[in-house]
C-alpha cells in the first residue's frame, strides 16, 4: 500500500486547516519562455494547427489573478463543441472572501474553422495572432461573471502522457497545455468593481483537448498542480470506464529543461468533507490523497465547498475547484496550489 494508514489518519485535520486558513496571498508568477516547444520529444500534431475549430473539442483556461489592488481570483473559462451541443461556461472565485459565481450558456457553433475564435453569444476564447498561439483572449459577459483576459504563450508546453495523446475511455484523446502564461486584462467583482490584472503576479493555464469519439463512460477527476519555487507543473488524470474495464491513474510532470515524466499513481478521495451537487445526486469529496510513484505524496483540499458550475446534464456540469496542498517531493516538504476538476459523463448509473 503506497499511502500509509498513518498518513490517512492525519489527513482530515490537515485538510480542514488548509481549507479554513488559506493564505491571503498566493505566489502567482508567469513563466518567461522564449519558445513553447523545442521539438526533441515527438508529438503527433502541430500545436498551432490543433487550435483550429475544425478539430472541435475543448478550449479551456484557468487564470490565477492578482489585481493591482492586491485582490486575488481564480477565473475559469471553457468552450466545448460536440456533435450534440456547444456551450461556454465560466466561473470566478475571490480567493480571500471566497465569493463564488458561475454560469453556463448553450448555443450553436459559431467557430471560425481556421483561426481560433470560438464563442457562444458574447463569451468566448480567441487567438489574437496569426499562429493561433502567441497571444489569446478569454472573455465572458454574464450578469454575475464578467472578465476580459489576454494571455501570452510564455510557458513551455506540458504534453499529456508525454506525446500529447492517450486512451480516454473508449476513444483516443489529444491534450496539451501552456501552464504559466503571462496574463493581463480585467475581472469584474460581484459589486461591479473592475479589477485590473497585475501581469507580474498573474498567470493562465491554457488547455486544449480533442478526441476521436465519445468520452469515458464513468467519471473523471483531473488535478492541475503548481509547486512555487520549483519548475514542476503537474497534470494528473484519474479516468474510470466501466465499459472497457479501464481505470487509468497517471501524472504528467513537466520539470526543468523540458524534462517530462509520466508516472502511475494511487489516489484516494476523502469524504469527511463533501459538497452535495445542486444538479444531481452527486456528493463531491473535498479532500484527496495522491501518491505519485517515485515522485511524491500530496494531501489536497478544496478551499470552498461550492465550486460547481451547474448545467442541465452531466457533461455540462463540473466541479472546478481551487485547491491547496501539502506534501513531499523526493522526500522534501512542499506546499502548493492548483485546481481539481470532477466531471461525470452521465448520471444514469448514480
From Swiss-Prot:
Principal localisation: secreted
GO molecular function, a single term: kievitone hydratase activity
Residue pairs linked by disulfide bridges in the UniProt entry: none
Catalyses which reaction(s): kievitone hydrate = kievitone + H2O
Signals that turn on the gene: Up-regulated by biochanin and phaseollinisoflavan.
Signal peptide stretch: 1-19
Alphabetized Pfam families for the sequence: Lipocalin_9 (PF17186)
Swiss-Prot/TrEMBL keywords: Detoxification, Glycoprotein, Lyase, Secreted, Signal
GO BP annotation list: detoxification of nitrogen compound; phytoalexin catabolic process
EC number: 4.2.1.95
One of the record's GO cellular component terms: extracellular region
Subcellular compartments: Secreted
The record's account of how the chain is modified after translation: Glycosylated.
Job of this protein: Converts fungitoxic kievitone to the less toxic kievitone hydrate, and thereby protects the pathogenic fungus against this phytoalexin.
Subunit relationships: Homodimer.
Name recorded for this polypeptide: Kievitone hydratase
GN (gene name): khs
Amino acid at each position: 500500500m503506497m499511502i500509509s494508514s498513518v498518513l490517512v489518519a492525519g489527513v482530515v485535520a490537515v485538510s480542514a486547516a488548509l481549507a479554513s486558513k488559506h493564505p491571503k496571498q498566493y505566489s502567482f508568477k508567469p513563466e518567461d519562455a522564449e519558445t513553447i516547444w523545442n521539438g526533441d520529444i515527438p508529438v503527433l500534431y502541430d500545436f498551432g494547427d490543433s487550435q483550429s475549430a475544425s478539430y472541435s473539442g475543448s478550449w479551456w483556461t484557468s487564470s490565477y489573478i492578482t489585481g493591482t489592488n492586491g485582490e486575488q481570483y481564480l477565473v475559469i473559462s471553457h468552450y466545448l463543441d460536440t456533435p450534440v451541443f456547444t456551450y461556454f461556461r465560466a466561473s470566478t472565485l475571490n480567493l480571500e472572501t471566497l465569493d463564488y459565481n458561475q454560469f453556463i450558456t448553450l448555443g450553436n457553433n459559431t467557430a471560425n474553422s481556421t483561426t481560433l475564435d470560438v464563442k457562444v453569444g458574447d463569451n468566448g476564447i480567441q487567438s489574437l495572432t496569426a499562429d493561433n498561439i502567441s497571444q489569446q483572449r478569454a472573455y465572458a459577459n454574464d450578469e454575475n461573471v464578467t472578465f476580459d483576459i489576454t494571455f501570452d504563450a510564455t510557458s513551455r508546453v506540458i504534453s499529456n502522457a508525454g506525446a500529447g495523446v492517450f486512451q480516454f475511455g473508449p476513444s483516443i484523446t489529444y491534450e496539451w497545455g501552456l501552464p504559466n502564461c503571462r496574463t493581463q486584462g480585467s475581472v469584474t467583482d460581484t459589486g461591479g468593481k473592475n479589477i485590473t490584472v497585475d501581469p507580474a503576479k498573474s498567470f493562465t493555464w491554457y488547455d486544449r483537448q480533442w478526441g476521436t469519439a465519445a468520452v469515458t463512460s464513468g467519471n473523471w477527476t483531473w488535478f492541475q498542480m503548481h509547486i512555487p519555487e520549483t519548475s514542476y507543473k503537474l497534470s494528473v488524470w484519474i479516468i474510470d470506464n466501466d465499459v472497457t474495464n479501464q481505470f487509468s491513474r497517471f501524472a504528467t510532470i513537466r520539470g526543468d529543461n523540458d524534462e517530462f515524466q509520466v508516472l502511475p499513481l494511487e489516489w484516494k478521495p476523502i469524504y469527511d468533507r463533501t459538497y452535495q451537487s445542486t444538479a444531481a445526486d452527486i456528493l463531491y469529496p473535498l479532500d484527496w490523497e495522491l501518491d505519485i510513484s517515485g515522485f511524491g505524496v500530496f494531501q489536497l483540499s478544496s478551499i470552498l465547498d461550492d465550486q460547481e458550475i451547474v448545467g442541465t446534464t452531466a457533461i455540462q456540469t463540473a466541479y472546478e475547484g481551487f485547491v491547496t496542498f501539502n506534501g513531499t517531493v523526493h522526500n522534501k516538504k512542499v506546499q502548493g496550489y492548483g485546481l481539481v476538476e470532477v466531471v461525470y459523463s452521465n448520471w444514469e448509473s448514480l
